[in-house]
């Protein structure tokens, strides 16, 4: 698969950087990466495309899970358990590949501010969630005031649509770019 990045920002693209680190560590949680192309312009340089392994017969996790639920399988299945294990493996492997940092007051405030921004966008996009606004904000306020673990690099925009079930291999995660319209500086900073 050849992926061309539609939004370019000066600096390493997290999709290339994170998957390259996981692939180099021998992770089976991501497609093998064959290479990337960098582009340069006045005062800037970034990845413009990446070539990755094509995953034959893959179905995205959203499709797999909703099919299971629609079939009446409401219990935790091996597939769901394996999906949780994949998520843990990716976070552990990223923690080993990139240096964790302390959750300073400044880092905490920056992350909490991003949570508020995302919540505002989500509530604007889905007005039916407005009745939950107070609970969401209260949760963020409470999270700000507890002890935080160290922060580390995490997969960006990680959700069921970014995970594929591959016959004979199991779950594989892709698209570590994060939300491309968010500033690169936010997408590469260590997180929870």
Please provide the spans of the model-predicted regions.
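Conserved ATP-binding subdomain of kinase catalytic cores across diverse folds
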Residues: 1-120, 124-127, 168-192
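The start of beta-strands in P-loop NTPase/AAA+ ATPase cores
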Residues: 48, 150-152, 156, 170
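An alpha-helical support segment within catalytic cores of ATP-dependent transferases
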Residues: 119-154
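Conserved catalytic-loop position in the HRD/HxD motif
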Residues: 157, 162
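Conserved tyrosine-mediated DNA breakage-rejoining catalytic core shared by Y-recombinases
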Residues: 165
């Amino acid at each position: 698969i050849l992926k061309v990045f539609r939004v370019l920002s000066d600096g390493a693209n997290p999709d290339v950087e994170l998957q390259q680190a996981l692939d180099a560590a021998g992770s089976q949680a991501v497609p093998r990466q064959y290479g990337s192309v960098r582009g340069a312009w006045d005062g800037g340089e970034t990845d413009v495309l990446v070539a990755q392994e094509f995953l034959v017969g893959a179905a995205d996790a959203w499709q797999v899970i909703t099919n299971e639920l629609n079939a009446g399988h409401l219990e935790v299945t091996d597939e769901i358990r394996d999906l949780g294990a994949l998520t843990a493996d990716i976070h552990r492997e990223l923690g080993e590949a990139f240096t964790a940092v302390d959750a300073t007051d400044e880092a905490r405030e920056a992350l909490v501010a991003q949570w508020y921004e995302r919540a505002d966008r989500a509530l604007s996009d889905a007005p039916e969630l407005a009745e939950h606004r107070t609970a969401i904000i209260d949760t963020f306020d409470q999270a700000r005031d507890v002890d935080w673990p160290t922060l580390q690099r995490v997969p960006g925009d990680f959700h069921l649509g970014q995970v594929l079930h591959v016959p004979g291999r199991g779950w594989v995660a892709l698209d570590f770019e994060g939300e491309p319209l968010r500033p690169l500086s936010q997408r590469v900073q260590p997180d929870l």
